[in-house]
From Swiss-Prot:
Record carries keyword Signal: no
Protein name: Uridine kinase
GO cellular component, one term: cytoplasm
Residues where ATP binds: G14, G15, S16, G17, S18, G19, K20, T21
Length: 210
């Protein structure tokens, strides 16, 4: 957990399509854009530029081993120390990291958003608030289907195949169990306004302690 004078870290976890981004937006609205640094865990998938494209297509993106945990910890620690970072960007059409990065400045609050945000013990130890966004599996699948076809150039068939072969079983094995680490569980996903209001009130109190 962060100490006096250091940024306050919030972990926002939950299944794919559960509403994590909506929760993160509420944090930004609560604290103010310039006061929040956001680390999207999707950008910390391992670089696969040394692997043939056809082989990349078979990557299990829903397994913890797909992530570069060391880099994520390193960059989170840099933000906690007040040092700007160059966050990698992941190209989901090429299934590897993009050549460019995004500069992220330190803020009073750091949000780590991703379905494995609460998976790593070292990352959890840096968090002042751990949130799990819960949503019905059917709702999550529909949201994922729309996102991947509209934003990531995927075909509906490939999204369905990935969901049945990887996403669902990996969620049950690795994501759902991290719910027990959460300080706050938001049922009904990002559409739960009363829960989001309560979360916002809690964040205001905790973020102002320093």
């Amino acid at each position: 957990m962060s100490g006096p004078g250091t940024p306050f870290v919030i972990g926002v976890a939950g299944g794919s399509g559960s509403g994590k981004t909506t929760v993160t937006r509420r944090v930004i609205e609560t604290v103010g854009r310039e006061g929040v640094a956001v680390l999207n865990q999707d950008n910390y998938y391992r670089d696969q530029s040394d692997i043939p494209f056809e082989s990349r297509l078979h990557t299990n993106y829903d397994h913890p081993a797909a992530f570069d945990w060391a880099l994520l910890r390193e960059q989170l620690d840099a933000l906690l120390a007040g040092v700007p970072i160059e966050m990698p960007e992941y190209d989901f059409t090429q299934h590897t990291r993009a050549a460019h990065t995004t500069r992220v400045l330190p803020g009073r609050v750091v949000v780590l958003e991703g379905f494995f945000a609460l998976y790593d013990e070292e990352l959890r130890s840096r968090m002042g608030l751990k949130v799990f966004v819960d949503a019905d599996a059917d709702v999550r699948f529909i949201r994922r289907l729309l996102r991947d076809t509209q934003e990531r150039g995927r075909t509906p068939e490939s999204v369905i195949e990935q969901y049945l072969g990887f996403v669902r079983p990996m969620h049950l094995s690795f994501v759902e169990p991290t719910k027990r680490y959460a300080d706050v569980i938001i049922p009904h996903g990002g559409m739960n306004e009363p829960a989001l209001d309560m979360l916002a009130a809690r964040i205001r109190v905790m973020a102002q302690r320093d």
